[in-house]
UniProtKB/Swiss-Prot annotation:
SUBUNIT field: Forms a complex composed of PxpA, PxpB and PxpC.
UniProt key word Nucleotide-binding: yes
Keywords: ATP-binding, Hydrolase, Nucleotide-binding
Gene from which this protein is expressed: pxpA
The keyword Nucleotide-binding belongs to this UniProt entry's keyword annotation: yes
Protein name: 5-oxoprolinase subunit A
Class of enzymatic activity (EC top level): hydrolase
Natural source organism: Kineococcus radiotolerans (strain ATCC BAA-149 / DSM 14245 / SRS30216)
Length: 256
């Protein structure tokens, strides 16, 4: 039986900027990418999310991003390596401590937004983030874009890795995500997304934006919680996968 993890970006809500229904998503996903506070979220809200994930039996991951609250961490920042490493270590420490305070633990790291995308294509940035993760806890798994540079850098550094695909994002023929600035980058057809993910898990391919097939092997699928109809799309994706005989479970062995 095929097995796949479902992950979502959570802990990003604040009273002035609610973006997702975390409670609903935690009933669907098996791994939670919890905001570390730099791009979104508040200390209280992040702790609430960590506690809720723990109670739901969902694996907890840290979701560090650029220090860019205004743009939700979606703009690339040109930072000195030492600054970026300190920022990542700081963020990991925050969620690590909150998880510990509720009797749980962070088991993986998935960078956010522009940092994630930059790491997928830029070896220098990936090397800095990998160094930060190793400095905090070398047992943490780095979750990154399937086929991206970041996973190669982490593998060479001896950091555990897992490959990820995106349920609601369009792909280029080269296997990269289509920029959110481009038309058609985010998919909204629930049935289409569900079918795409079943095909990805069963056949290891996804249709690119130009209609060609791209090989994608992933251990986790991201179902975003901050897009319109996100909960319904995530639920439909899970239902389609289980209906196809796919087991849904955390990608980190022994996380739950």
């Amino acid at each position: 039986m095929a097995t796949i993890d479902l992950n979502s970006d959570l802990g990003e809500n604040t009273p002035d900027r609610p973006v997702s229904d975390d409670a609903a998503m935690l009933r669907i996903v098996t791994s939670a990418n919890v905001s570390c506070g730099f791009h979104a979220g508040s200390p209280e809200g992040i702790r609430d999310t960590v506690l809720a994930a723990s109670r739901a039996g969902v694996a907890i991951g840290a979701h560090p991003g650029y220090r860019d609250y205004e743009n939700f961490g979606r703009e690339r920042l040109d930072l000195p390596a030492a600054t970026l490493q300190a920022h990542v270590e700081y963020q990991l420490g925050a969620v690590w401590a909150l998880a510990r305070s509720v009797g749980d633990a962070v088991v993986y790291v998935k960078p956010h937004g522009a940092l994630y995308n930059t790491m997928a294509v830029d070896e220098a940035t990936a090397s800095v983030v990998v160094a930060a993760v190793k400095a905090v806890d070398p047992s943490l798994v780095l979750l990154g874009l399937a086929g991206g540079v970041a996973l190669d850098v982490a593998d060479r550094a001896g950091l555990p890795t897992a490959a990820e695909a995106f349920a609601d994002r369009a792909y280029t023929p080269q296997g990269q995500l289509v920029s959110r600035k481009e038309p058609g980058a985010v998919l909204h057809d629930v049935d289409l997304v569900a079918r795409r993910m079943v095909r990805l898990v069963e056949d290891g391919v996804v249709e690119a934006i130009d209609g060609t097939d791209v090989a994608v092997r992933a251990e986790s699928l991201c179902v975003h919680g901050d897009s319109p109809g996100a909960v319904g799309m995530a639920a439909a994706t899970r239902t389609a996968l289980t209906g196809a005989g796919v087991e849904i479970a955390p990608f980190v062995a022994g996380a739950r």
